[in-house]
Amino acid sequence: MLGFIIRPPHQLLSLLSCPGLRIPRFSVLCAPPRLRTMAASSSFSELPLVAVCQVTSTPDKEQNFKTCAELIREAARLGACLAFLPEAFDFIARDPEETRRLSEPLSGNLLEEYTQLARECGLWLSLGGFHERGQDWEQTQKIYNCHVIMNNMGSVVATYRKTHLCDVEIPGQGPMRESNSTIPGPSLESPISTPAGKIGLAICYDMRFPELSLALVQAGAEILTYPSAFGSVTGPAHWEVLLRARAIETQCYVVAAAQCGRHHEKRASYGHSMVVDPWGTVVARCSEGPGLCLARIDLNYLQQLRKQLPVFQHRRPDLYGNLGHPLS
């Protein structure tokens, strides 16, 4: 099914720019019918195309990889230069003990499979939240929630370990203690250059801390990515609001690949993966099931908007300090 959102013609993002392409199952793509002619223009079709994948991870790592690989191959077939996977793309366990048992180091078999997949497809990958056994695994028996960027040759070019852990008690959603099995990362990662633009790395709960996004944009980020696994209570209330807020305040594209559906008897996720442009408009989104959506990234539009609305020139650190001080 197509979902239509009326939005400025210079930022229309959809598959309609690629005549003859088959729309993937479960995708929802944003394009008002009256702008289809414009969407097929050569200048629009030359913009970088990104794919945002939505999955329902379970404790079955092999099946999870098969699902993700199918979506990545579809993204490559459709002409994307970069595919985004959600937090916990590798698995979602039933308890901390199962999390520890299923986790791997970055040098393990699973990332080697993704290395081969990136080479096969010629695609950059944002692997949004890998359960990593770090160098301190033997001492701590805890993992890092690690966001991995892999280039189209299969090389890991950036890693970010989630710095804000989700230890919360939400009525109707149940308690969550990420710190039971996870260590917070020690630092932020400088934005990484990709074919789609300079990407600032974050994960899920990080989006609730605007200082992080401000630090990333002041360090040069053009795209902020929040791979996530939002729950069924916080999702409807906060998901889109937070993503649009981060896009507006930083004047960045925001890409948010999400987990969806029921993972096992103890957990379900909200879904609704999306891309938000620097104006704050949702330009692509997935429906509730597994699938992908596509968006084009227009960095000229981003720069134009930053010139027209120069909020970073108007900041007053003399009054409130430099929130989100640039990364060193």
Curated annotation (Swiss-Prot):
Q: What is its main location?
A: cytoplasm
The active site lies at: 87 (proton acceptor), 162 (proton donor), 204 (nucleophile)
Its localization reads: Cytoplasm; Mitochondrion
Q: Which reaction does it catalyse?
A: N-(4-oxoglutaryl)-L-cysteinylglycine + H2O = L-cysteinylglycine + 2-oxoglutarate
Query: Is Lipid biosynthesis included in the keywords of this UniProt record?
Result: no
GO cellular component entries: mitochondrion
Q: What class of enzyme is it?
A: hydrolase
Keyword annotations of the record: Cytoplasm, Hydrolase, Mitochondrion, Transit peptide
Q: Which residues form the CN hydrolase domain?
A: 47-299
Domain of life according to the entry: Eukaryota
Coiled coil regions, renumbered to chain:
none
The record's section on Gene3D superfamilies has: Carbon-nitrogen hydrolase
According to the UniProt entry, what is the EC number of this protein? 3.5.1.128
PANTHER family the UniProt entry points to: DEAMINATED GLUTATHIONE AMIDASE, NITRILASE-RELATED
Q: What does this protein do?
A: Catalyzes the hydrolysis of the amide bond in N-(4-oxoglutarate)-L-cysteinylglycine (deaminated glutathione), a metabolite repair reaction to dispose of the harmful deaminated glutathione. Plays a role in cell growth and apoptosis. Has tumor suppressor properties that enhances the apoptotic responsiveness in cancer cells. It is also a negative regulator of primary T-cells.
Please identify the protein, giving its name as recorded.
Deaminated glutathione amidase
Organism name? Bos taurus
